[in-house]
Amino acid sequence: MSIFNNVKLKLSLGLGILLFGMSSIFGFQVSGENFDANFKISSWTATKNGSVITSEGIVGEGYGKVYLTHTFSSNNPEGSSGDFVGQARTINKDGEMRFASLQGIWKREGSIVNMYTLDAIDNGVMNYAKGKVDLFAGTLNFEVYPID
């Protein structure tokens, strides 16, 4: 093997490793079984340190009517990103009620807030959800991914 071929091989190998590493860093994607959860904002309250948004909607997967409360805190003066905590209550037609804790991060771009949340339900079910809040339209739309 000539020196030229050896350098070419090492360069190709290094470039391949670099591209694979970059795709791992910049290619975070969630996939798998999921369901939609759509809500209407019922109130939006300003606080000294952020906002509290309550919402409600009908969600499949046995959840039924779902009520959410999210307390948002900003990590910058522009109010363009931060974290949140929240609670959920669900009631289905059979009268089965569930409670959940919600926590995650958010980033606002104009009137749209992108949310990334991890939810723990009182029956042991855990979900990851990503969604969009349209502050002008008053809607929250999530893709929910059950965590095994």
Region roles according to the model:
Residues 25-148:
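Beta-strand-enriched cores of mature, soluble protein domains
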Residues 12-24:
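Bacterial N-terminal signal peptides
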